[in-house]
């Protein structure tokens, strides 16, 4: 079971990240897990730390330095998405990189779960509703679509 763990480089709450990895594995009854991680600060490095501390294999995907940074990260994330059986997104709702991962999961029909970090519960619900609304466009949409998702989620907040 290849579990792609990804999220914002700004999320550094080790206890929260560890708990979400464990929750995801338990909820889905995953066995023989290998963590796929992209060697980025934040969630990636902490997911690797969790794996090592639990004796779980890690497959590392460093960005290819032949490309510019943004393209290298996208290519690396695309490779991890293609190779995963499930993706765990630990997202603050702002990271374009994690949004890119959501889009890639939609593009390649990969199952995923999003846990929101440091967002009020009503915004988490609104994001979930908005992502569902945009689902058919996510796979082919530009990463700037995140701005539309935010705008729509805020409209839902204002109407409640």
Language-model region placement:
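Charged, low-complexity interaction regions
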Residues: 138-146
């Amino acid at each position: 079971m290849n579990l792609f763990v990804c999220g914002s480089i700004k999320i550094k709450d080790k206890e929260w990240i560890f708990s979400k990895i464990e929750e995801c594995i338990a909820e889905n009854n995953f066995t023989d897990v290998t963590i796929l991680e992209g060697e980025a600060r934040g969630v990636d490095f902490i997911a690797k730390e969790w794996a090592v501390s639990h004796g779980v294999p890690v497959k590392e995907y460093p960005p290819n330095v032949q490309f510019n940074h943004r393209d290298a990260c996208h290519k690396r994330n695309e490779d991890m998405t293609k190779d995963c059986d499930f993706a765990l997104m630990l997202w603050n709702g702002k990271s374009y990189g994690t949004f890119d991962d959501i889009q890639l999961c939609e593009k390649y029909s990969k199952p995923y779960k999003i846990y929101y970090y440091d967002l009020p519960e009503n915004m988490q619900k609104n994001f979930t509703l908005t992502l569902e609304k945009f689902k058919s466009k996510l796979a082919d949409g530009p990463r700037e679509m995140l701005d539309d998702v935010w705008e729509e989620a805020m409209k839902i907040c204002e109407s409640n």
